[in-house]
Amino acid sequence: MQWETVIGLEIHVQLLTRSKIFSGASVAYGARPNSQACAVDIALPGVLPVLNRQVVEYAIRFGLAINATINSPSIFARKNYFYPDLPKGYQISQLAHPIVEGGHVTIRTGDKEKTIHLTRAHLEEDAGKSTHEGFHDKTGIDLNRAGTGLLEIVSEPEMRSSAEAVAYARVLHSLVRWIGICDGNMQEGSFRCDANVSVRPAGSDVLGTRCEIKNLNSFRFLERAIDYEVARQIDILESGGSIVQQTRLYDADRDETRTMRSKEDAHDYRYFPDPDLLPVVIPQEWIKQIREKLPELPEDRHNRYIRDFSLSAYDANILTAARELADYFEQTVKFLPEQIKLCANWIIGEVSGRLNKEGLEIDQCPVSPEQLAGLLLRITDGTVSGKIAKDVFDSMWQSNDNSADTIIDAKNLRQISDNSEIEKWVNEVLAANQQQVADYRAGKEKAFNSLVGQVMKMSRGKANPVQVNTLLKKHLIE
């Protein structure tokens, strides 16, 4: 039997505020356990929550970015369950009236585009953290994270493979960083994914029983966890068994999912409106002000790069993966507007490759857009070859005060374009390699590349490669 995978994601985005959603306690990462938990966070009797205006603005900003509806009023509800790191015995969340409803994003896998619709995005507080290591037969509770503001983003179950799920998660990860509401640090838990996975016979419209995989904090783990879970469910169904609805954890060391608890439904949490928090009424004028402050969004830039810069969808996709990278590209193009494709190639290749190798972000790049444009200008005007330019780029990276021209002159790297000098090297190479000359004339193209390499070696890489090719072919057909 052929099976179809059905995936929906719930993504928890930690909002980039300085204080918590309902208290003034700090949200700085890495503080001493329980040093950033105030009376509200630890649920002392008599204390009341006060909503942080900034988290509401961030939620509206996200909703506008995905063309969603901003609900007014929006209502907070109590989600009741017991867990040691949940001091109140309930979590303040949203159910019937989330702040953001609907919306969509576009994902790309290979050369295919697909629209993924969102169900909702709602505000809630994070729980604390249970620690089991270092406590013999006990559990340590750290409430520093309790009360941190989260935006939970829930998709429709429209993804059909782990690749689509990862593409969707990457789009949201890029978007929340792009609009400045989250730092996207997955290692610190700022962006966490829960995957709801089920399978059904191909062609069926009936959803299968789903299992939720909790707290996936890397795109690689998200992909591997989904692939394992799909295979597990298919194996059970083809063996005549049935899927039990449950919450599961992904064990990265063993590359498998395992049962955490039976999966609850909304009614199990006994939601009801929080009597300590008024409905949030959002004026249209405030929404308008937030909309006017939004930057050009990644999808709009992606389309503009294809339309105005004639870049491929692949190039545009990479360049708009992060706002800082797109800004770096556009600043480079401003200095070299006639060489847009060359700028794109170098930023995607040399610049991004070096950043990845050294674990740096684009805003830490020691070569500025102006310096990079200066180097690329020397390629286009024939001062240096592409190969030599890579050596110059390496020197610029190591000594960020140096311009391309300074390094080229200091190291005597200017390309030689004097026909008579290049012809002298060509004649010497041809005279010394009669067998390769004969091989080329007999139809062996590889012999030509060898001859080119020897001329470039003789010139210490400084001969103009276009002229070398032209002169070699001229002499070889004589």
Curated annotation (Swiss-Prot):
Family listed: Belongs to the GatB/GatE family. GatB subfamily.
Enzyme class: ligase
Reaction equation(s) it catalyzes: L-glutamyl-tRNA(Gln) + L-glutamine + ATP + H2O = L-glutaminyl-tRNA(Gln) + L-glutamate + ADP + phosphate + H(+); L-aspartyl-tRNA(Asn) + L-glutamine + ATP + H2O = L-asparaginyl-tRNA(Asn) + L-glutamate + ADP + phosphate + 2 H(+)
BP GO annotations: glutaminyl-tRNAGln biosynthesis via transamidation; translation
Listed SMART domains: GatB_Yqey
Keywords linked to the UniProt accession: ATP-binding, Ligase, Nucleotide-binding, Protein biosynthesis
PROSITE patterns: GATB (PS01234)
The organism of origin for this protein: Nitrosomonas eutropha (strain DSM 101675 / C91 / Nm57)
Protein name (database record): Aspartyl/glutamyl-tRNA(Asn/Gln) amidotransferase subunit B
Described function: Allows the formation of correctly charged Asn-tRNA(Asn) or Gln-tRNA(Gln) through the transamidation of misacylated Asp-tRNA(Asn) or Glu-tRNA(Gln) in organisms which lack either or both of asparaginyl-tRNA or glutaminyl-tRNA synthetases. The reaction takes place in the presence of glutamine and ATP through an activated phospho-Asp-tRNA(Asn) or phospho-Glu-tRNA(Gln).
Record's subunit section: Heterotrimer of A, B and C subunits.
